[in-house]
Amino acid sequence: MKHKAKDIIASGDWTYGPEWPVIGLDIGSRGSKGVLLVEDEVYTALIPTGLYMQETADDLLGRLLAESGLQRSDIAFIVGTGYGRISLKYDDIPYKVVTEISCHAMGAHAALPETRTIIDIGGQDSKAIKIDPATGKVVEFVMNDKCAAGTGRFLEKAAALLGIELDELGPVALESKDPAPVSSQCVVFAESEMISLRARGERNNDLEARANIAAGVHLSAARRVHNLLGRVGIEPGLAFTGGVSNNPGMWQVLETLLKSKFQVPKLDLIFAGSLGAAVYAGKHAAASPEVAAKYQARPFVWSKADSPAAVNDAVEVEFDRSLAC
């Protein structure tokens, strides 16, 4: 999807426009995201992660090039991040990997410049990140990657047990007035509790029980994440990134626990990691003598008229964004 940079940055002050086209690729465990920066325009693409990470990355790259009207040879630099970053290789384009924590921090900072504290909930882990609001650099972070509790995978299992689609789980939870008790310490215990609670609800043919279980699941996951935040400290300027940031139930319960509101982004922060990777790609390109020599020999010329006009939805494959991590 094509965006004007000024339309997706909260402050309207876009200072990340690179001199040459750069790309950030965030290859997640379930979904993969790409961002292409060129002048004052931002292109995004979102697809499910396939079996082979390189093929997924190449698919994203092709979609971004098709939408922007650019050629592969025009790209100055690519930065890869996310679960599959170490599997990627490019022989014809300068490429580096940057950790997903650094990229989520930089992406949140670029989209929401007041950000100081980030919650990132993905399919396999959750993170609490404190950043320097002046630079977007990570100051401190903690993560939960040892247990599925507090992750998108936990929510996915809950939705399956309740017999609903994952994107329905959040809205169903919002219908609850009395969240059911669900363990926040272990996903195995939580699953057992959900089965028992569901059985009682089914015996009573009680849709209210389903909503209460869904709300309890969200509260359980949110408490796990809240504990992570307590270890890094919570400062004003909260940002919520990752696929689970699209879940309205999780958004609400976290705000309740935190007694604070998340900043509302103009760009879906499922793209935080890939946006941050693209920003880092711009920095690497600017510092590279090899890249400078390439464009000195063949100056980059791009006409916005080359960008296809009717492709706004063509580059995003429809699938459940709430676990596109």
Please identify what each model-predicted range represents.
Residues 82-84, 234-257, 268-273:
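Glycine-rich phosphate-binding loops at beta-strand->alpha-helix junctions
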Residues 95-101, 255-275:
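Conserved phosphate-binding/catalytic loops in two-lobed NTP-binding clefts
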Residues 192-228, 270:
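Adenine-nucleotide phosphate-binding core of ATP-dependent small-molecule kinases
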